[in-house]
Curated annotation (Swiss-Prot):
Biased composition (Polar residues): 553-565
Residues that bind ATP: L46, G47, E48, G49, A50, Y51, G52, K53, V54, K69
Gene: lkb1
Names of required cofactors: Mg(2+); Mn(2+)
Keyword annotations: ATP-binding, Kinase, Magnesium, Manganese, Metal-binding, Nucleotide-binding, Serine/threonine-protein kinase, Transferase
Extent of Basic and acidic residues compositional bias: 518-527
Basic residues biased stretches: 385-395
Organism, as annotated: Dictyostelium discoideum (Social amoeba)
Active site: D168 (proton acceptor)
Disulfide feature: none
Family annotation (SMART domains): S_TKc (SM00220)
Protein name (Swiss-Prot/TrEMBL): Serine/threonine-protein kinase stk11 homolog
Free-text function comment from the UniProt entry: Serine/threonine-protein kinase that controls the activity of AMP-activated protein kinase (AMPK) family members, thereby playing a role in various processes such as cell metabolism, cell polarity, apoptosis and DNA damage response. Acts by phosphorylating the T-loop of AMPK family proteins, leading to promote their activity.
Signal sequence, start to end: none
């Protein structure tokens, strides 16, 4: 691949498809270099707060996108109970398992960096606040408001059943997936009522002031803890359907006074059922305030609302993080958690708009190939290297061949006897003299070249010089990751480690095996030229079978480790937006 010596552009590895400049791909200035913390690759900042920030990221083991909250411990220690509050948030979120609750994946501390990392599932559709900002007149269509509010009811029903009070329900903390599934997030001020000896701490105002109920703004001594969340739900509903807050004020004192008076104005043309629902939720007396059961069964929540206006769209989905080769020892702001770098290996980022790919990111979905079934169509590297084999009647050799056949049958799970072996019975060939399996090291091969089982997939996955999308990242990732026994044997390093520069030819499915042929060395050539023997007792069976590759969802296989040849940080490669045959080295 040709390298631009003086690049005038660097690309961000997060893109948004609504910015169409180059075939649906818009390149934007990269704000920060991607970093690796533990086994998470960090991307751009999604949001910032008083105590830290949230970054886009990817789990390099599962190739699943994540959101990483990064908190500086020095700042937390300046706040009374700061670290304890964060640990409480972690413990509360860990116990919640519901489709409408943000999922906590991991959490850890890196002492030398003085930072706490909390890893959540990635929810890319944006927040209710994002939707409101993009909505005409700042409000949502009635049917969309109803759709969102119904899911919010389910989320609150679940957390209240687990004795959890959120205490900060608002549009900013209501997220959406691109499948329009609501996710309630940010349990930073939440409380587990089952762990409280008394409810005095709940009487203090937390969260956003505009969403606080009168019992907290008036510092009342009696209140219903779970009705705090219900009040915030009412304010959120008012904001979604009318486009403004029900209460406002020039300062905090005026705002709290207006909340206590609870004088609410409604447009004249607003749905009467909706007015009745909001009034029932925003009751000053918490005893008279609607319960979740009353809200769920209210006429406005259960009736059909026609779609007069179109839905306000979610944020556009962005493509993300295709390939990673190595763990790097990050020396940047948010790194330091790697296992060791990849030396001169490259950490490659690119993009792919084609979503019609098979999802192989789950390591359990590894195909198996049956004996006698030919592997997927690949270029024949040695089409002229055909040999005619003679059959020998030596009984001892025949027993060895039968034993070898049993081993191959045990591996492949099929009884086809049209197999060929070399003189040492170490290599297994199909009826077309294609090397299928090396019994010395249990290595899958296609035309004599080692491949990972995941590469045996028959679907023609698109590979290009501009990377891939998240669906097929696991497939292409295997081309640059050594096998499970690399670290112990070092055998595959001989084949792969000497080719660190990745070219467009490497990613071309028609040239991929040709490119790797030189790295295989004379070992495979001599193996292919050795005398082969036919162990088949059914030599007259000339029936050919079509390629058949089966997926076994129940089959479990660990994800191969990433290469870690040294502690140096990997190079970062970004593709040129002007010429896809070029790349830019950072």
């Amino acid at each position: 691949m040709e390298v631009e010596q003086q690049p005038s552009y660097t690309s961000n590895f997060i893109i948004h498809l609504n910015e169409n400049e180059d075939n649906g791909i818009s390149y934007r200035s990269r704000k920060s270099t991607p970093k690796l913390v533990k086994h998470y690759i960090l991307g751009e900042v999604l949001g910032e707060g008083a105590y830290g920030k949230v970054k886009d990221g990817m789990d390099s083991f599962t190739q699943k996108r994540v959101a990483v909250k990064i908190l500086k411990r020095a700042r937390l220690k300046k706040i009374p109970g700061g670290e304890a509050s964060v640990l409480k948030e972690i413990n509360i979120t860990k116990k919640l398992h519901n489709k409408h609750i943000i999922k906590l994946i991991d959490h850890f501390i890196i002492e030398e960096k003085g930072k706490l990392y909390i890893v959540y599932e990635y929810v890319g559709g944006g927040t209710s606040q994002n939707i409101l900002e993009n909505a005409p007149n700042g409000r949502l269509p009635p049917h969309q408001s109803q759709f969102i509010f119904r899911q919010l009811i389910e989320a609150c029903e679940y957390i209240h059943s687990q004795k959890i009070l959120h205490r900060d329900i608002k549009p900013d903390n209501i997220l959406f997936t691109h499948a329009n599934v609501l996710k309630l997030s940010d349990f930073g001020v939440a409380e587990d009522s089952s762990q409280l000896e008394d409810f005095e701490c709940l009487s203090r105002s937390y969260g956003s002031p505009a969403f606080q109920p009168p019992e907290l703004t008036q510092f009342q001594t009696t209140f219903s803890p779970f009705k705090i969340d219900i009040w915030a739900m009412g304010v959120t509903l008012y904001l979604m359907t009318i486009g403004k807050f029900p209460f406002s004020g020039a300062n905090m004192f005026v705002l709290f006074e207006n909340i206590s008076k609870c004088k609410i104005e409604f447009p004249n043309d607003l749905d009467k059922d909706l007015v009745n629902l909001i009034k029932g939720i925003l009751q000053v007396d918490h005893i008279q305030r609607f319960s979740l059961g009353q809200i769920k069964n209210h006429p406005w929540c259960i009736k059909y609302i026609p779609e007069v206006e179109p839905f306000v769209p979610l944020l556009e989905e962005s493509k993300f993080l295709p390939l990673e080769m190595a763990y790097g020892d990050d020396e940047g702001d948010d790194g330091g958690g790697g296992r060791g770098g990849g030396g001169d290996d490259e950490l490659i980022f690119g993009y792919e708009n084609d979503g019609n790919t098979i999802d192989l990111q789950d390591p359990e979905y590894i195909p198996s190939i049956s004996v006698g079934d030919q592997p997927p169509s690949t270029p024949i590297l040695h089409s002229s290297d055909h040999h005619h084999h003679h059959h020998h009647n030596n009984q001892h050799q025949h027993q060895q061949q039968q034993q070898q056949l049993q081993q191959s049958q045990q591996f492949h799970g099929n009884g086809d006897n049209n197999l060929l072996f070399d003189s040492n019975n170490n290599l297994i060939f199909d009826s077309n003299n294609n090397l299928l399996f090396n019994t010395n090291n249990n290595e899958h091969l296609i035309n004599g070249l080692p491949v990972h089982p995941i590469e045996l997939d028959p679907v023609n996955i698109k590979k290009s010089s501009i990377g891939t999308n998240i669906s097929d990242v696991a497939l292409i990732r295997e081309n640059y990751i050594c096998s499970d026994n690399d670290a112990s044997s070092g055998q595959d390093d001989e084949d792969y480690s000497d080719d660190n520069e990745i070219s467009g030819e490497d990613l071309n499915p028609t040239n991929h095996h040709h490119h790797r042929a030189d790295r295989v060395g004379s070992r495979d050539k001599s193996s292919r030229s050795s005398k082969r023997k036919n162990s088949s007792s059914n030599n007259n069976n000339n029936n050919s079978t079509s390629p058949k590759v089966e997926f076994n969802p129940n089959r479990s296989s660990p994800q191969p480790p990433l290469r870690n040849s040294s502690n140096r940080r990997p190079k970062i490669t970004f593709e040129s937006p002007h010429n896809k045959s070029k790349c830019i080295i950072n």
